[in-house]
Amino acid sequence: MNTSNAVRAEILTQAVPYIKEYTGKYVVAKYGGNAMTDPQLKKSVMQDILLLQLVGVKIILVHGGGPEISAMLKKLSIESHFENGLRVTDDDTMEVVQMVLAGKVNKSLAADLSALGGRAVGLCGIDGGLIKVHQKNEKLGHVGEIDEINTKILDDLLDGGFIPVISSIGIDDDGNPYNINADTAAAKIAAALHAESMVVMSNINGVLRDKDDENSLISQMSLADAEELKKSGIIADGMIPKVDCCTNAVKEGVKKVFIINGEIPHAILIELLTDEGLGTMFTK
């Protein structure tokens, strides 16, 4: 056996205990950032999702699409406004959000999985009342706070051998659509399912002890660690809501949550199925 074949065999052998750990368990992957726009990275993410399903993982893909929404709004001469990182979503903006997220982005991802031989079903939180919400703040317009996840729809799809691909749009009791932060949607879905893991793909490697030093990655963090790092200012600015989303998921019953760099090919498989790992893991 040549060296490269030996390495391949070692990688496959290394994956066995992790596959055993995850088989039959729920894993929620939140997809966003540059990994959504680069064709090769996109293909590697879809391959990872499909492989996880093939080895028996109940995998669910949740996606955002902020850059695509902003680009379409610009084309339509509709100005984008943000408050504390949340898109102010008036009636016109909400129409564009639905068109881009539930239409273009969602169906494109479902088609990509299908092209690789997967059986994907693209849906948004409106479908079947999957994500029930109420208005977060009148000033923000159609921005929703999640009340409930209808897990039966997801279980029915997963039991039928399908991969749910979910865009982060919710619905209230009066049938009004709402824009939802995709990280939050993924965390609430993972918590409702008591998922084994949630993986958040981002444009960063994880939580850094020194934001200017890529080698200062914190590979594992407890809930108490996260609070201490926030107090000390190591977790600051835009990392605070992302970390809060991860720690809230753990508090609500998700066993492990990872922030990984989606710009690394096959980052999901490396994080979940090898000894190496890539990003920051949050646990109780």
Residue ranges of predicted features:
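Nucleotide/pyrophosphate-binding catalytic subdomain
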Residues: 1-263, 270-272, 276, 283-284
